[in-house]
Amino acid sequence: MVMAGGTGGHVIPALSLARALQSQGVAVEWLGSPRGIENRLVPEASIVLHTIAISGLRGNGADGWLKAPLNLSRAVLQARGVIKRFKPDVVVGLGGFASGPGGLAARLSGIPLVIHEQNAVAGLTNKVLSRLATRTYAAFENAFGTRAEVIGNPVREEIAALGEQPRQVADMQGRPLRLLVVGGSLGAVALNERLPVALAALPPERRPEVRHQAGKERDIATADAYAQQAVVAEVSPFIDDMAAAYAWADLVVCRAGALTIAELAAAAKPALLVPFPFAVDDHQRVNAEVLVRAGAALCVVQAELTADYLSELLDQLLYPETLAEMAAKARQAASLNATERLAQGCLSLVKQGETA
């Protein structure tokens, strides 16, 4: 049984794992929460989804903390009911609200528990579960100290395949360079507002082609901002096919979520990273350091991201020679067998007949 929910950063790597397990003849069902993105993506993948009533603790005030023991107890009972019906041999959690009670339920039911942390700083749920888990995996060094095996993040096969031949200088000659801006499903207001002004400050002959994912209900205002600056850009609220978007791009401007970092490395894409400043424990900034240290990305904190500074950074990066060098370094930083290692870790517990 796979547990993951809330955001694509948890659900999409978990789907990669689920597909890998299914390819080896494993029956997979899913435990999530009622309002997360899993409610769309998991049924679309033809996987049975069970939901339990649970929400996060952070940001819910004193009332939320007072009700937490009762709510958690109810959710654990619901999760035990799912486990009793499905009878999984292994339960694997990749974060999200349902993973906490689901992991406790697995432990109470005597079923091996595997967890995987996608971020450089472990979340609250996984910090607790790491002390109960049969096996603990992490994408980054030091997420759990010494208690975890570091394997990287699962990445979709179609994205990993893009980086097999990192883009060369010759591939970018004879055409404008291509800039992909990705703000996530809700968009990034800072990018939406500052990219048009920053690009307008570049000489027309230095401006790249632009595809900008602006977020739900933010695409019209962003398109207007580009038009006001006389900068040509293709603006959309969502990107349904990220593999195709990465395949098109020479440079990506984006946030620094764990999934994004893993995909950029696997797809061999240079990046200008702007970590989300309100991420829990500032984990996006720590995530970004992996690609920055590798020479595959630049990182700027949002508080310093003026349009003028952004224009300077783009002017620094938008050369085929620079981008080709960064692309090669991105691929070198990729962990390409994370899905396989996580799947084999789960399957080995079944073969060994281990209990939690």
Specify the residue positions occupied by each region the protein language model found.
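Conserved nucleotide-sugar phosphate-binding/catalytic loop shared by glycosyltransferases and other
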Residues: V2-G5, Q22-R74, K216-R218, V301-A303
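Short amphipathic alpha-helix
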Residues: H10-L21
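Donor-nucleotide binding loops and adjacent catalytic segments primarily
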Residues: G36, L41, A45, E164-V252, ...
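Active-site-proximal region of nucleotide-activated glycan assembly enzymes
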Residues: V48, R107-Q165
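Glycosyltransferases and closely related glycan-assembly transferases
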Residues: Q78-V92, S99-V114, K127-R131
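Acidic donor-binding loop of glycosyltransferase active sites
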Residues: P88-V90, A247-A262, K269-P270
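A short, well-ordered alpha-helix in the C-terminal region of glycosyltransferases
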Residues: T322-L336
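C-terminal alpha-helical cap of glycosyltransferases
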Residues: L336-A356
